[in-house]
């Protein structure tokens, strides 16, 4: 009997805060498919997870960020093609760039209070990442 090996598709991104202030808003994107989530994208060959996150954030939002890689949360789920999806999220703080939206990927970008973001994020495991990020930052809701 032949056992097919599950392929793992890896993406990396970040929970992006507008600043390091405790009450900083968080960036939530609405993908063209209608899901509300964090910026992320596929790891390209020879990239580190951090490099992927920085590149995807710049490509999709125009923002330049500083990553805090001491915070690192992974989510896993199965895709309809039978592959496993693994997302790695860091925390990021905006440090520059000019905000613009990659229109073939996103339909909206929203800066929200974390408590509002929690209410609109599509997937529970992404909401859990936000909870962990807030705890890590010791920031009030």
Ranges and model annotations:
Residues 43-69, 73-129:
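Unchanged
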Residues 16-18, 30, 93-94:
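Residue-level signal for short segments within beta-strands and strand-turn junctions
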Residues 132-140:
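C-terminal alpha-helix
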Residues 29-36:
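Short, flexible turn/loop "capping" segments at secondary-structure junctions
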Residues 7-9, 21, 31, 82-84, ...:
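A generic fold-level signal
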Residues 2-26:
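Conserved N-terminal beta-strand and adjoining loop/helix that marks the start
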Residues 19-21, 33, 43:
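Short, glycine/serine-rich, charged loops/turns that create anion-binding
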Residues 37-41:
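A short gly/proline-enriched turn/hairpin at secondary-structure junctions
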């Amino acid at each position: 009997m032949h056992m097919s090996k599950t392929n793992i598709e890896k993406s990396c991104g970040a929970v992006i805060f507008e600043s390091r202030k405790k009450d900083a808003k968080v960036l939530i994107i609405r993908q063209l498919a209608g899901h509300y989530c964090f910026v992320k994208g596929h790891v390209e060959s020879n990239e580190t997870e951090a490099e992927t996150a920085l590149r995807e954030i710049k490509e999709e939002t125009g923002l330049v960020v500083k990553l805090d890689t001491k915070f690192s949360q992974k989510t896993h789920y199965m895709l309809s093609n039978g592959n496993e999806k693994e997302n790695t999220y860091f925390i990021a703080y905006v440090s520059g760039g000019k905000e613009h939206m990659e229109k073939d990927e996103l339909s909206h970008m929203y800066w929200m209070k974390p408590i509002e973001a929690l209410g609109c994020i599509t997937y529970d495991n992404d909401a859990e990442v936000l909870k962990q990020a807030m705890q890590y930052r010791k920031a009030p809701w």
